[in-house]
Amino acid sequence: MLEHHIVQITQELGLQPRQVAATAVLLEEGATVPFIARYRKERTGELDEVQITAIRDRIEQLETLDKRRESILSSLDERKLLTEELRAKVASAATMTALEDIYLPYKPRKRTRATIAKELGLEPLSELLWAQDPMTDPEKEAAPFVGNSVTVDAKTSTVATVAEVLAGARDILAERINDDATARARLRSLYLEKGVMKSTLVSGKEEEGAKFKDYFDWSEPAATAPSHRILAMRRGETEGFLYTRLTPPETEALGALYGLFVKGSCPAAEQVRLACDDCLKRLLGFSMEVEARTFYKKKADEEAIRVFADNLRELLLASPLGQKVTLGIDPGFRTGCKVVLLDRQGKLLANEVIYPGRSRGEEMEAAEAILNMVRIHKVEAIAIGNGTASRETEAFVKKLNLPSSIAVVMVSESGASIYSASEIAREEFPNHDLTVRGAVSIGRRLMDPLAELVKLDPKSIGVGQYQHDVDQAALKRSLDDVVVSCVNKVGVELNTASRHLLAYVSGLNSRTAASLVSHRDTNGPFKSRAELLKISGLGPKAFEQAAGFLRIRDGAHPLDASAVHPERYELVDRMAADLGCTVTDLLRDPAKRAAIKLDRYVTPEVGLPTLKDIVAELAKPGRDPREQFEAFSFADGVEKVEDLQPGMKLPGIVTNVTAFGAFVDIGVHQDGLVHISQISDDFVKNPADFLKVGQKVQATVMEIDLPRKRIALSLKTKVELGPRQPRQGGAGGRPGGRGEDFSKYMRQDGGRPGTVNDWFSMAQQRKP
């Protein structure tokens, strides 16, 4: 990596040069982000995963820039256009935009109006006009060019009049203005700073595009438009219902060009002015609009991806129930409830279908089936999917008078149907149908959400915002980073983990993970981390990256169950020897751990950060960083939207956090929306600062729209209630006030349109 890149990244991220340089070297050596953050703190100055990821991404961006720079230099050199001055300009371009602006005048292009004008011999006239000499008479100077013609590809172009000659000369000037780097920079800033995003309805699409009705005639400054509104407008355009533009005030755009290129008010200057007008309308304006739209689309994508990634992290790190014998129930009315019995390792032991809601006799049979499984297999928990018939099934189970020690927990079904039809599920359960696989997934999600959710494409989990509209490559990378981060943060039990979970461990991939599982199945459980080196395809580098994140209970070495890396076993052995005890004694005796003098073990490679991590691991080897599991129950007697009344205070769980608010499951088969204005009594700029996916809340029902099954909730201490049914012609005032039309309340920012239909569609898609 070039030294000037290190300096640039240092300045951009506010880090020390040595931190950036060390991280760059480690990444180049093949180290992963989790490994660097956990086991190379001394080299990086204790950078965290976020900082390391930022360095990694910026390095890749700068390397891409350098590749493009070399390509441009090569192209210019081959065409004998590369001067020392131009080489210096290309070399100094700090961004891809600046680089492309420099290259634009020299870029091979298709035949344009300007090239045709040049072929007609009008370039000398354009130069004369460009000079804007007050003594120049444009029409007089143009007269000698009348009648010029050129034939290209059997097509003849001719300038027959003075007006056509001047128009051709202006075409040359317009392209010259368009290619000017200063003009492009000036206009780019104007479009970004003062551009207005406008959307209008495509004629005849009122009914089809009703969900975008808020945008049928809408405009706002692009610089302050929330990401979800930009994405909503773009979605409406993509679906053919909206026409959108992003432009600054035209007078300012023209004024910028006039200021750069027009000198005075002579006839020649007027020709340059007309060329500026044409350039803005036909060339530069279009180009800058595309750039500005791309800029704000990327910005909106980044925000939406960040929201998705934050939500996914919270979901993956949700509290696990742990290894308990569990019943997983996928509820249903007509087709019955699919029940599976899982042992403490999540292995499927039995399955059957019960029909608790069809008749008294079948309900008794269902009760007997559940009670028998609980009694015979000593069931410790029951997981119920939160889809159709979930509350009814929960009520049925709770009527069985089960021991209070058995937790009955509602579990999100989001993505379960996708898993049940996946190749992974077919491999795991080739002899069982979709319904059984789905119920297994529900039960396992309660036991260990992380281990089960890694089997899904993160995009199918349902905690995103406009996830199908954003840059899919960027989304995938961000979500993959989150999954890798979470898996390695928690650590993986080597002898029980699935190959799907192992594949996300630092240093491993799907191939080496499959080899690990195959070796385990053939030779029995791993007895030590050192055995990993016997795996085909897993060399010393992969071992270095992976070993610390893999745990072996009751392994050959007492530290195999901890996050202490094998490269530090010798150090811990020395600590124990210096105290006259064993490593096992250090694990068991707090007094002995307290007696360790860390300063004695500091070396250039091992500093206090690593030593403190080691001692922390000795205190709680292999500790799970996830919070302790706490059972949650919805309010009894409130099982469907029709049961709700304004003013009810209900327990709920946050299921999705977006830029405009959060969705909360209150147990009625339909998530309610807590608009950003109703999250807190304090001002809320970013909902994610106040709420997380999986967070338990007490929500107040504000309004209910029964026909459309929409629920408005509030988390504020003082709530102004709306109607139970939608009312037209509300009283106005602040959003959510009593008597105001419900759909109007759901608009953004006190009346600014949002995509209410899209928002609620997101929630409705979660619940069958």
At which residue positions do the language-model features occur?
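C-terminal accessory/binding modules appended to enzymatic or scaffolding proteins
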Residues: 14, 319-321, 484-518, 636-672, ...
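Accessory alpha-helical DNA-binding modules that contact the DNA backbone or grooves
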Residues: 32-33, 44, 48-152, 156, ...
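Duplex nucleic acid-engaging cores and interfaces of nucleic-acid transaction enzymes
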Residues: 48-54, 61-328, 334-432, 439, ...
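Long, charge-rich intrinsically disordered scaffolds of nucleic-acid metabolism proteins
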Residues: 85, 98, 102, 409, ...
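A glycine-rich phosphate-binding loop feature that marks nucleotide/adenosyl-phosphate handling sites
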Residues: 189-196, 329-333, 387-392, 411-418, ...
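Long, charged amphipathic helices and adjacent flexible linkers at domain junctions
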Residues: 292-309, 425, 460-491, 600-646
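Single-stranded RNA-binding regions, centering on S1/OB-family and related RNA-binding modules
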Residues: 552-768
